[in-house]
Amino acid sequence: MNTDTLMTKKDSKQMKYLQQAVRLLEKKGYREIKAELPDYESPTSFTERSSDKSYTPDLTGQKDFGKDYFQVVEGDKKNVQDVVSKWKLFANLAKIKNGQFYLLVPYGRKKYTTELLREYNIEAELMKLER
């Protein structure tokens, strides 16, 4: 399997998770949903000052009086520091915007997710995604 095929397969799986998450947010009464999907406005990117790296949440949405941030857990064990930086940034942004940070956890990634949250003291709620 070549790299392009692997990327396409990963992208289509990510797209499926994002579509599933958008449906879930709509059912829960979120408004102003932004997602990296056709027919949706893209979420705003944020740059971490200490590293100059730019991060974009997978989804954002307004509910009640706050803005919530959502990220699909990819299980990236090679770039743990990037993952941790991204999650910490989104958790802090959610707090500033009177919202919450949610990690959308696909089947098989719960242990990885809970270990990172505990080890790096990151505040996030978990939402399970279907297979």
Task: Label each PLM-derived region with a short phrase.
Residues 91-98:
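Arginine/glycine-rich "motif VI" loop of SF2 helicases in the C-terminal RecA-like domain
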Residues 37-38, 72-76, 104-107:
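Structural motif
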Residues 2-15, 27, 32-67:
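Active-site metal-binding core of divalent-cation-utilizing nuclease and nuclease-like domains
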Residues 66-70, 98-103:
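Hydrophobic beta-strand segments of well-ordered beta-sheets in folded domains
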Residues 14-21, 81-89:
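Well-ordered, non-membrane alpha-helical segments in soluble/globular domains
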Residues 103-131:
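Domain-level recognition of nuclease-like catalytic cores that cleave nucleotide substrates
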Residues 57-86:
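Conserved catalytic cores of phosphodiester-cleaving nucleases, focusing on short active-site segments
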Residues 26, 95, 118:
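Anion (oxyanion) recognition and catalysis
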